Amino acid sequence: MSQNEHCQDSGEYFSAGTQGYFKNNMEDNLEVREDSLGDEVFDTVNSSIVSGESIRFFVNVNLEVQPSKSDLEAATGGCVLLHTSRKYLKLKNFEEEVRAHRDLDGFLAQASIILNETATSLDDVLRTMLNRFALDPNHAEPDCDLDLLMAKLFTDAGAPMESKVHLLSDTIQGVTATVRGVQYEQSWLCIICTMKTLQKRHVCISRLVRPQNWGENSCEVRFVILVLAPPKMKSTKTAMEVARTFATMFSDITFRQKLLKTRTEEEFKEALVHQRQLLTMMMPRAAGHSMSSLHTHRHPQPPKCKDFFPFGKGIWMDIMRRFPVYPMDFTDGIIGKSKSVGKYVTTTLFLYFACLLPTIAFGSLNDENTNGAIDVQKTIAGQSIGGLLYALFSGQPLVILLTTAPLAIYTQVIRVICDDYNLDFNAFYAWTGLWNSFFLALYAFLNLSLLMNLFKRSTEEIIALFISITFVLDAVKGMVKIFGKYYYGHHYHTKRTSSLVSLLGIGRSPNSSLHTALNASLLASPVEMATTSSPGSTHSGQATAVLSLLIMLGTLWLGYTLYQFKKSPYLHPCVRETLSDCALPIAVLSFSLIGSYGFQEIEMSKFRYNPSESLFEVAQIHSLSFKAIGSAMGLGFLLSLLFFIEQNLVAALVNAPENRLVKGTAYHWDLLLLAIINTGLSLFGLPWIHAAYPHSPLHVRALALVEERVENGHIYETIVDVKETRLTALGASVLVGLSLLLLPFPLQWIPKPVLYGLFLYIALTSLDGNQLFSRVALLLKEQTSYPPTHYIRRVPQRKIHYFTGLQILQLLLLCAFGMSSLPYMKMVFPLIMIAMIPIRYNLLPRIIEAKYLDVMDAEHRP
């Protein structure tokens, strides 16, 4: 059985709900190895379990190699046999095991810490650590041969060539087993060695300057822990026990990130002591979690009637959970050792452009759909006010509010109804928004956000992919309009020709003098004359269309290239991270300058702007009849369903366990706050806003510290820590509000193709981690290129494709209603989203077995 297969079976064993560990006695083997070095070699990696969101264990691998003889090599072609075995070890309990504290105290008293090790090969790193023992008087071992000790750390793999291939003899490496599969913790490696000539135990920790690739499952090593000890020791003092102590500490990904930030040995020691205190407090609590509770957490039960009462319980619990940490939302990353001012600045700039440009685009669309009742100026004002209030008072400030395409569609439907029935648009719009806020407040007080537990991961990803498609569709529609007007349309050329005729005074009354016509022609600007001269005028429209397409694709290319730049090997890591965080602002500014200044002789399509006569005007809600108010209630109810689903869905994606947020959730309070904000926006005729996808998950990603690992050639990222702050959303909202001073210029210098490129960028970046999109891509790949995901290993391939096909059908159903040309069909779009719940629970299990559905759903719910 291969190593990966064995790990997979182990993960399935523990997911069944049994806790325990396997232990093999290695003492005899270690003695034999000392007596006959080279006759028999071992490579050991130990395993352990921890309760919580997943199962953590260490892998113990023993490789036994018989030296190949020359004649045997000739017969077998250099092939040798490797025997692999594993055993499980529990994490050290710092609350109960006194030895764990003594191991750490002994290390701190005679610490051997190497910071910023520049060596790149494992041999050089270990030799540096052994030399540290030799030079340190506290670790003097007069009878120890360093060359022999170095040889014992490695195992000859039996390679027939003169250059031997080395395998570590005895190591510990952390592994996390979840329902999604097995993940190696590749940033640290604990190496164990026993030797009779050693007098006492020794521990050395080396922190590498850069991650090193030392083979499979060790592709991003930053820490090396070396444990040396004599073989004859008390059972609680063996090399394995000491290694288990330090392996337990390094199994915490947050702790490893803290160690990376330390600058001196004293800070390194302080981090070790602090981690011991945390483990002492957390171990009893962690031990109380059972595997059954973990299983329930991953697959929450549907809420019962009693869960929705008492009235307002969820709101009160949210406030009590979030209020104690409210001051920290302003100080985290600003005060203390872990400062993140630079990341806050880049994230604020990213949010500013990510919010402002869609706001301008949808504001221009609202201006066209409402005949100027809601324009760009009002849309920017509403975005700024709503964003400020939500960033200040929300329970989860990482969620970003934004007006969206479905809301623009609802606004268009309201305008059509008002025109058909001769109603006051502002009053009817206000009543629809008030009813929407009333239902949202009712949902919040009744704790209906608990119903979101019914949404499986597959359903969430269908809706998320639908939103990404709408961004792509908006960009394509905009580009089609540009080509229709400038490339194919005759109206543009006729308009240009007529402007030339009027410019020269041809066709005027007989009283017009030639002198006036000549003056008009001479006073015309060079650009205007260039665009109206022949034959260039017949091609200027085509140039506009082609340039618009290039600018849109260029904005997408530059933005996404810089976004992925942090994964490249070029420049310093800090520079790569800064460029990645500022990818969107750089792309927008660059191609705005190219479109507006690089090609001044070519006309570019810009958004429509008409300044509002009264920015804040209260709607005359008393002017409508009771019948019209009742009609607005129906629209408000359907709109509230859209708000409810979008708000809770995006909040669930932000609060997902893999994001490692620690300050708690506030679904019910945030829903009530959303109702309050939209009440004010409705009364003043400003566009509605709700939680935006993918802006909110991208906001989390921008504030996250990420650790990478490589498995089978595929790079996976794990979020280590997220700065849960209000400052970035506050700063972006303030900048959006100040953008009102930039209207009409210089904001109108941003061509529409740049906005469309932004839409494509947002859609493309939102596909990262979307399992539905990944499974659709499998249809275009050969089977040997399939990634080693959990569903590939545990679900038959035919079932995977069946499930993907059924999800695509649901996605097409959403698109049929959400993108319909009939406005009234778009209004029932929220009902279609709700209809996916019975489809998932009642229809899909009849086609695909429930056990396979659960694996592919891989439910993660806070």
Curated annotation (Swiss-Prot):
Record field: catalytic activity: tetrahydroxoborate(in) + 2 Na(+)(in) = tetrahydroxoborate(out) + 2 Na(+)(out)
Membrane-spanning residues: 344-366, 380-393, 399-415, 429-452, 461-481, 543-564, 578-599, 628-645, 671-691, 722-746, 753-770, 775-797, 803-819, 824-844
GO MF entries: active borate transmembrane transporter activity; bicarbonate transmembrane transporter activity; protein dimerization activity; proton channel activity; proton transmembrane transporter activity; sodium channel activity; solute:inorganic anion antiporter activity; symporter activity
Extracellular membrane side: 367-379, 416-428, 482-542, 600-627, 692-721, 771-774, 820-823
Tissue expression pattern: Expressed in the endothelial cells of the cornea. In the inner ear, is located in fibrocytes underlying the stria vascularis. In the kidney, is expressed in the thin descending limb of Henle loop.
PTM notes: Glycosylated.
Location of this chain's protein in the cell: Cell membrane; Basolateral cell membrane
Gene disruption phenotype: Mutant mice show corneal defects characterized by progressive thickening of the stroma and descement membrane concomitant with increased sodium chloride concentration in the stroma. They show impaired urinary concentration, increased urinary volume, and increased urinary sodium loss in the kidney. They also show stress-induced morphological changes of fibrocytes of the inner ear resulting in deafness.
Membrane topology reported for the UniProt record: Multi-pass membrane protein
Keyword field: Anion exchange, Cell membrane, Glycoprotein, Ion transport, Membrane, Symport, Transmembrane, Transmembrane helix, Transport
Matching Pfam families: HCO3_cotransp
Primary residence: membrane
InterPro entries given in the database record: HCO3_transpt-like_TM_dom, HCO3_transpt_euk, PTrfase/Anion_transptr
One Gene Ontology biological process: regulation of mitochondrial membrane potential
Known function: Multifunctional transporter with an impact in cell morphology and differentiation. In the presence of borate B(OH)4(-), acts as a voltage-dependent electrogenic Na(+)-coupled B(OH)4(-) cotransporter controlling boron homeostasis. At early stages of stem cell differentiation, participates in synergy with ITGA5-ITGB1 and ITGAV-ITGB3 integrins and BMPR1A to promote cell adhesion and contractility that drives differentiation toward osteogenic commitment while inhibiting adipogenesis.
Family: Belongs to the anion exchanger (TC 2.A.31) family.
Subunit structure: Homodimer.
Name assigned to this protein: Solute carrier family 4 member 11
Natural source organism: Mus musculus
Gene it is expressed from: Slc4a11
